[in-house]
Amino acid sequence: MIIKNLQEFYRLLIPNAPLIAIDYGSKKLGIALSNQELSIAMPLNTITEINKKIVITSLLNIIEKYKVCGVIIGLPIDMSGAVTEQTNIVMKFAEELAKSINLPIYLQDERLTTKAANNLLKSFGVKRKDRNNNDDAVAASMILETVLDSIKNI
């Protein structure tokens, strides 16, 4: 189920279980995982498959493996706050994922996270090819970190 309110999302979480975050792109998905205490976000991996059924199966495997209690999906909103074509694509994906899992899903504004992730990797001297392979997972960890920081204030 997609939850629009962060406090409600937090209330539905199982204690001592991690969250995953997804940075959904047209060519790949970045995945990040929190620790059980919901205090640290770490890049996990990148899914380069574009077939939605295979993507959802991969996500279900990750959810089961790490015993995840909730999912955060980065929502790409225009800098002005307007909904874009990519926003609608991500919302549709979130709805499809919600049909496959019985976990709360929260959509988090993700403006500029992939660019920030790429810049961060660049500042560490990571080569372009490696940046392009990892920037979505790092962006997912930034999205997750934003939510974890907000949860601390609930």
Swiss-Prot record:
It is found in: Cytoplasm. GO terms for biological process: rRNA 5'-end processing. The keyword DNA repair does not apply. The keyword Phosphoprotein does not apply. Its EC number is 3.1.-.-. Keywords: Cytoplasm, Hydrolase, Nuclease, Ribosome biogenesis. SMART domains: YqgFc. One of its GO terms (molecular function) is nuclease activity. Its main location: cytoplasm. It holds the Pfam family RuvX. It is an enzyme of class 3 (hydrolase). InterPro entries: RNaseH-like_sf, YqgF, YqgF/RNaseH-like_dom, YqgF/RNaseH-like_dom_sf. One of its GO terms (cellular component) is cytosol. Could be a nuclease involved in processing of the 5'-end of pre-16S rRNA. Belongs to the YqgF nuclease family. PANTHER family: POLYNUCLEOTIDYL TRANSFERASE, RIBONUCLEASE H-LIKE SUPERFAMILY PROTEIN. This is Putative pre-16S rRNA nuclease. It comes from Rickettsia africae (strain ESF-5).
